[in-house]
């Protein structure tokens, strides 16, 4: 055990020396445009996903407080045992209607959703054609499943077509893309992607974490 700790310590020291060690930013105020941290005051927050300001919206906060009185705090179970309450189904219905979809499922984070999606739906006879700049959660989710993997250049429809051609004999084909690529701000060419999906009989999976309610 001591040897393992020594290895971990050496690895951490190397990461720190390389300047790639990640320290948490500790925020001492609610999420908003300007925040305070333990090392600075009045910082302009440019890295949150609070695009619509819902985290500090008074109506949202009041509704959350009221929900505790009506529904209690916490699920007390996983969803499929006894952790699904009527309010969850109501929210799923509202989200599905907003997106124009048949149904939806709530996850605690998009990372969890992407991690569980592909393995659930796809097997060894299937294929995932993934944009090279997709979020790490999509990449990790793809790695967890047994489907064949194809990667196309970012937003490059000619390369996507070539990868679809290479995967044409697979049973189920899924094109996976970010809607808005979070690290670069590029917007996926969804009309062209969907046209190619129709041409090759593929499904389209879009991670729209950075677009829903904001870009459309």
Question: PLM features: what roles do these ranges have?
Answer:
Residues 133, 180, 208-210:
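Conserved Walker B
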Residues 124, 145-146, 200:
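Short, structured coil segments at secondary-structure junctions
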Residues 120, 138-145:
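Active-site-proximal loop->helix
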Residues 62-110:
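Conserved N-terminal alpha-helix of the aminotransferase class I/II PLP-enzyme fold
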Residues 6, 10, 14-73, 202:
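N-terminal "arm"/small-domain region of PLP-dependent enzymes with the aminotransferase-like
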Residues 50, 150, 154-206:
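Active-site phosphate-binding strand-loop segment of PLP-dependent enzymes
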Residues 117-136:
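Conserved PLP-anchoring active-site segment centered on the Schiff-base-forming lysine
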């Amino acid at each position: 055990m001591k040897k393992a700790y020594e290895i971990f310590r050496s690895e951490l020291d190397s990461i720190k020396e390389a300047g790639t060690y990640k320290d948490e930013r500790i925020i001492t105020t609610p999420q908003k445009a300007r925040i305070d941290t333990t090392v600075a005051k009045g910082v302009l927050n440019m890295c949150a996903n609070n695009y619509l300001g819902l985290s500090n919206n008074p109506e949202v906060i009041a509704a959350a407080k009221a929900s505790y009185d009506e529904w209690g705090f916490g699920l007390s179970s996983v969803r499929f045992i006894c952790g699904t309450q009527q309010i969850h189904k109501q929210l799923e219905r509202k989200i599905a209607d907003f997106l124009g979809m048949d149904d939806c499922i709530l996850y605690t984070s998009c990372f969890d959703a992407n991690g569980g999606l592909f393995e659930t739906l796809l097997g060894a006879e299937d294929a995932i054609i993934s944009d090279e700049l997709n979020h790490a959660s999509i990449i990790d989710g793809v790695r967890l499943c047994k489907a064949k993997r194809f990667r196309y250049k970012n937003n490059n429809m000619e390369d996507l077509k070539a990868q679809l051609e290479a995967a044409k004999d697979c049973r189920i084909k899924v094109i996976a893309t970010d809607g808005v690529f979070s690290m670069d701000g590029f917007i996926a060419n969804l009309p062209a992607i969907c046209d190619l999906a129709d041409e090759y009989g593929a499904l389209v999976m879009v991670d729209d974490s950075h677009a829903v309610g904001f870009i459309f």
